[in-house]
From Swiss-Prot:
Gene name per UniProt: pcp
Subcellular location: Cytoplasm
Alphabetical keyword list: Cytoplasm, Hydrolase, Protease, Thiol protease
Entry EC number(s): 3.4.19.3
Highest taxon, organism lineage: Bacteria
Keyword Protease: yes
Organism: Lacticaseibacillus casei (strain BL23)
One annotated Gene Ontology cellular component of this protein: cytosol
Gene3D superfamilies: Peptidase C15, pyroglutamyl peptidase I-like
Name of protein: Pyrrolidone-carboxylate peptidase
GO biological process: proteolysis
Length: 215
């Protein structure tokens, strides 16, 4: 089994992005699965081209995209991607879409193929906070989540894909009072546990348990 794990570069006012920093620190093999790591730009459309090329080259069984969600307390596997770009800030290319449909021939939304409940449970059992999330936002995180699902729908039907958000790092909240943070070590531990759950549930679907939050 091969799993492509992507992480965004820094964006906005931050000089570091926990997503790519955690991805870079993942082992090359987890639970027997080969881990392919990829840094992607925080840019609408360009990020999708980079991931598309990597999927075509690596032919992974799974794609797990990682992104930063400042303000969240826990790692949050995402349930659904929506067909909408609505940037609260410009991306790293200076582009800020407003109420923009990502693909006119795409579904209004795509649900992940990842076992998100099993992932959240495994992360917590590893000692790291986690919960299923029902919104990936409308910035570049949702964009790449949707784009990979669209690719699966139109080009790569054999892959399974999804997205997971992680909180700020402690150094990112020094000037952000009362904002939650999680250490890089915990990020890596949590992502590793999530990937182990993906491998363990391959071909079995997700577990039946109560998960999720209002957001």
């Amino acid at each position: 089994m091969k799993i492509l794990v992507t992480g965004f570069d820094p964006f906005g006012d931050d000089k570091i992005n926990p997503a790519i920093e955690a991805v870079k620190r993942l082992p090359d093999e987890i639970a027997g699965a080969q881990i392919v790591k990829l840094e992607i730009p925080t840019k609408f459309n360009v990020s999708a081209d980079v991931v598309k090329d990597a999927i075509a080259k690596e032919k992974p069984d799974y794609v797990l995209s990682m992104g930063q969600a400042g303000g969240r307390f826990e790692l949050t596997p995402e349930r659904v991607a929506i067909n909408l770009d609505d940037g609260r800030i410009q991306d790293n290319a200076g582009y800020q879409p407003l109420n923009h449909t990502i693909h006119g021939d795409g579904e209004n939304a795509y649900f992940t193929q990842l076992p998100i409940k099993a992932m959240a449970k495994a992360i917590r059992e590893a000692g790291v906070p986690a919960a299923v999330s029902n919104t990936a936002g409308t910035y570049v995180c949702n964009h790449i989540f949707y784009q990979v699902q669209y690719m699966r729908d139109k080009m790569f039907p054999d892959i399974k894909a999804g997205f997971m958000h992680i909180p700020f790092l402690p150094e990112q909240v020094v000037t952000r009072p009362e904002t939650p943070a999680l250490s890089l070590d915990d990020d890596v531990l949590g992502i590793t546990a999530a990937i182990k759950a993906i491998v363990a549930r391959d071909g079995k679907g997700d577990i039946e348990t109560i998960e999720g939050k209002n957001h």
